[in-house]
């Protein structure tokens, strides 16, 4: 934690009032914190603060105690309790040590990191920039505290969608830490985790996996397999494998992240919600819609309570629930979820963030399901423009946007506009995700349906067959997407008077849907 840097500053040993030592609870709190026992650390730091205040309200040790107590609160997800402590610590440190002291910078970094966690990005940035300027001037450009502030600023820029800036800072922080601290230091793992999170967003999957696995190994070795610090790389690995279509591999790290979070931090902690959100997305992709909704609703409740109703993480969960509702053909539920997510994101992230594009795509899906084509088209087009600009023209998210827009055009009989969009979506998916990815299969189904609408039956049939092969392999034979493809293929067979085969396909689709609707045993 950034705030722990406060505790590293040398303080002359001096017995507190009544012969009680301030250093004793500080050291005990530091040990508990490093071991991930944050509630215990909180109690020790509170005791240290009480003893420090006996030395005088403006004593630098009061600022140190406040900073560490705030770090414990933040680790516990109690952001509202942490902020006033850090602001008081900053006032004391500036008054006692001057505005350019490293302890002032450490407190500024802690405040900035807290602001980022709270979704208050505009407030966080100037704090972090001031901290970085102090650290570089006073400590030198290769000091570990410079790396800590660089990492905090990179995390903020990543959350804001400023990926180029974030990468430069993350790489610099990693280089400093590896040089000064060694490759197996836990602070190196923090830089690795931040860089892995960035690369996952950019679909740089090979680099993401290497960095996340290395971060996890460092933290497991240094801290143990059940320390809260292992949660973040596990969540990244779960997200990564899910996006790659490696669903069995995705579930294990995501479930482990949830178990660690619930045990170490409690079931209502934001870290638990992050793991739940990954599991909800995984269940949604695998066609386990009831499970996905339960997980998503639980994540939403945690995030709304812990972070507030307008936090960007709340919007992320809302967007996932909107996507789920659209998959279940529940447009009336999907649209308000997508609109609420979009409103939060435009307010907190700006109008051109990739998360805004995701909510726009979900909104477009809801509108398309309601035959509100004139409203859906600008939503899809805006999502595509954002993703191309912020993520690049070959991002898998761009492929999703293209496919959605292509389907809208197909439903409007705008076939000449639809086909190149599908073709481009397919090419992106095959290149970035691989030719057997479920997203590629879904695009092939849509392309086949386009050909069917144009009576290009000889071209459509092998595409349906190919897509079904891919979907059964990747998703399993009983997935709702398989049922949908069977129904589309059956419609083609009817059009070419192969009624018996069509009936067989429809029967298979009905069996899948009946099985999915049956209560779990």
Segments from the language model and where they lie:
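Intrinsic-disorder-linked linear interaction elements in eukaryotic regulatory proteins
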Residues: 1-521
């Amino acid at each position: 934690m950034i705030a722990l840097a406060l505790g590293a500053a040398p303080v002359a040993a001096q017995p507190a009032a009544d012969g009680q030592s301030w250093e004793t609870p500080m050291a005990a709190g530091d040990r508990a914190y490093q071991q991930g026992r944050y509630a215990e650390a909180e109690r020790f730091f509170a005791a240290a603060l009480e003893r420090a205040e006996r030395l005088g309200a403006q004593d630098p040790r009061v600022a140190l105690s406040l900073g560490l107590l705030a770090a414990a609160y933040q680790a516990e997800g109690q952001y509202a309790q942490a902020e006033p402590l850090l602001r008081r610590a900053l006032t004391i440190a500036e008054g006692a040590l001057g505005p350019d002291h490293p302890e002032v910078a450490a407190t500024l970094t802690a405040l900035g990191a807290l602001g980022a966690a709270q979704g208050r990005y505009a407030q966080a940035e100037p704090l972090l920039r001031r901290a970085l300027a102090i650290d570089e001037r006073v400590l030198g450009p290769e000091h570990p505290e410079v790396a800590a502030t660089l990492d905090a600023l990179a995390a903020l820029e990543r959350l804001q969608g400023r990926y180029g800036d974030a990468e430069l800072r993350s790489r610099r922080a990693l280089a400093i830490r590896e040089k000064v601290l060694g490759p197996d230091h836990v602070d190196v793992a923090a830089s690795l985790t931040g860089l892995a999170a960035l690369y996952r967003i950019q679909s740089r999957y090979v680099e993401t996996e290497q960095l996340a696995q290395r971060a996890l190994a460092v933290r497991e070795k240094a801290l143990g397999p059940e320390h809260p610090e292992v949660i973040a790389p596990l969540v990244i690995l779960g997200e990564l494998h899910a996006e790659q279509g490696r669903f069995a591999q995705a579930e294990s790290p995501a479930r482990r992240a949830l178990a660690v979070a619930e045990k170490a931090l409690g079931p209502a902690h934001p870290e638990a919600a992050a793991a739940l959100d990954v599991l909800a997305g995984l269940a949604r992709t695998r066609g386990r819609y009831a499970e996905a909704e339960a997980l998503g609703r639980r994540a939403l409740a945690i995030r709304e309570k812990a972070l507030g109703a307008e936090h960007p993480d709340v919007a992320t969960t809302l967007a996932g629930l909107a996507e789920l509702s659209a998959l279940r053909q529940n447009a009336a539920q999907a649209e308000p979820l997508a609109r609420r997510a979009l409103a939060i994101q435009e307010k907190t992230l700006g109008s051109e963030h990739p998360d805004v594009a995701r909510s726009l795509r979900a909104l477009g899906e809801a509108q398309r399901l309601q035959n509100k084509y004139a409203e859906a088209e600008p939503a899809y087009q805006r999502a595509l423009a954002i993703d191309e600009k912020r993520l690049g023209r070959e991002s898998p998210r761009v492929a999703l946007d293209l496919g959605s827009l292509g389907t809208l055009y197909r439903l409007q009989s705008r076939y000449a506009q639809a086909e190149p969009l599908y073709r481009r979506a397919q090419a992106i998916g095959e290149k970035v995700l691989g030719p057997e990815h479920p997203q590629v299969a879904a695009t092939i189904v849509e392309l086949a349906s386009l050909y069917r609408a144009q009576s290009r039956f000889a071209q459509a049939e092998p595409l349906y067959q190919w897509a079904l092969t891919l979907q059964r392999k990747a998703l399993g034979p009983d997935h709702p997407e398989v049922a949908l493809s069977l129904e589309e293929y059956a419609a083609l067979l009817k059009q070419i008077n192969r009624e018996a085969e069509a009936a067989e396909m429809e029967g298979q689709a009905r069996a899948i849907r009946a099985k999915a609707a049956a209560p779990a045993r």
